[in-house]
Amino acid sequence: MARIIRVGGASSETSWHEALKDLRADDVLMLGPGFYYLPQGLTLTDITIKGTGSVPEDTTIEGYISVSEDSRYVTLENLCINTSTDNNSLFVPVESDGYLTLRNCFVKGNGTDTAAIAVNGKITVELYSTKVINGSVSMYANASFRLEMNDSLIDYKSDKYCALAIEGQGTAIINNSNIHGSINTFAKTNAELDINNSEADYILLHGQTWMNMLNSTVRAKDDSCLYLSDDCWSNIMNSKFNGGVYIDKKTRTIIQNCTINRMVVINEAKVTMSNSMVTAHSDFQDEATCEATRVSFMGNMNYEYFLALSGNAHLRGHDLLLHPNGADLAIQDEAKLHTNVIADKDEKLSVECNKRPNVYILGIQWTAKKK
C-alpha cells in the first residue's frame, strides 16, 4: 500500500536519512523546504518525491538521482536538483522500461560535457514546466524513448555540446518550450521530432529524422541555424529562421509560410516551398531541385546574387516574387530556372547565365549577361 512520508517542516514524521532507508515501492515522499544531501546519489524505484515549498528552489536536493533497472516510474514535483559533481543529475539505465516525470522542477547540471538528464533504455520522459540548466538532456543510442516537453526550458549554450541530444529510436515532442543551445540528431538516429510554438538557437539534424515544425523560431544568425542532412524528412510551417538554412544530401523538405534569412540547398536534396520568403540569398547547387509557389526571393548588398543556381540544379517556380535589391540572378553550368513572376520592384532583371535556353522567366523583362 502506498504511504505518504513527510520530511522537514512542522509536520515532519521522520528524518531525511531515515526516510531513505525505509523507502518502498509506491511511496510518496513529501519534502518540506530545505536542503537535502545525497553525496553518494540515490537510486529510486516506483517513487514520487514532492517539494512543498512555494517554488522548486525552496526544496533542493544536493546530489544526483538514478532510476533503477526495474522501476515502473519515478515522479519528481516542485523540486530543485543541484549536481556539483561529475554525475548526471538524473540517470536512466539501459535496462529500464518505465516513466520518468518531472513537474515544475529545476535541474542544475555541473556545466561540463556530462548530461544533466541522461536517458537510456525503454523510457517515457515527461518534462512539464521544468528548467534544465548547465547540462544537456540526452537520449543515447541505445534508448527507445518518448520525450514530451511542455512549457519547459533547457539552457545549455556551448560551442562543443548540444542542449538537446536525440539519438536512438523514438519520438520527441517539444511544445511551448525554449532551448538555449542546439537541438541535435545523429547518424544513428531514427526518430520523429515535433517542435510546436517553441524556440531554439540551432537545429542540426542527421540520420533518419522526421521533423514537423510549427509556429517556431530558430534564433541564431549563423549560416547553418537550421542544418538538414542525411535522410531527414522535414515539414516546416509558419516558422522563422534568423540565420541560414543549409540543406544537403538526400533530404526531403517542405517549407510553408516561413521567413528565412538565407538558404543553401546542395547534393540531391529536394525542397518544396510555398508562401514563404527568403530575405537575403538563395543558392541551389549540384542535383538539388526546388518547387516554389508564391515564394519571395530577395537580395541585399551583402551578397552578389540574390538567387543562384549551379551544377544541375533545377528551380521550377509558380507566381514568384523577385526583389533583387541591387543583386543579380545567376544561372550557371547546366542549372535551369523555369518560372513565372507576378511582382518585382525593378522593371528589369539582370540574369547572369551561360546558356540562355536554360532560363525561362515569364512576367518580367530580363536581360542575359555573362560575368
Where are these regions (language model features)?
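Right-handed parallel beta-helix/beta-spiral solenoid domain characteristic of secreted/periplasmic
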Residues: 8-12, 46-92, 109-111, 221
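Extracellular beta-sheet-rich ligand-binding/adhesion modules
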Residues: 4-8, 40, 45-46, 57-65, ...
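Short, T/G/N/S-enriched strand-turn elements that build extracellular solenoid repeat scaffolds
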Residues: 15-23, 36-44, 61-69, 88-95, ...
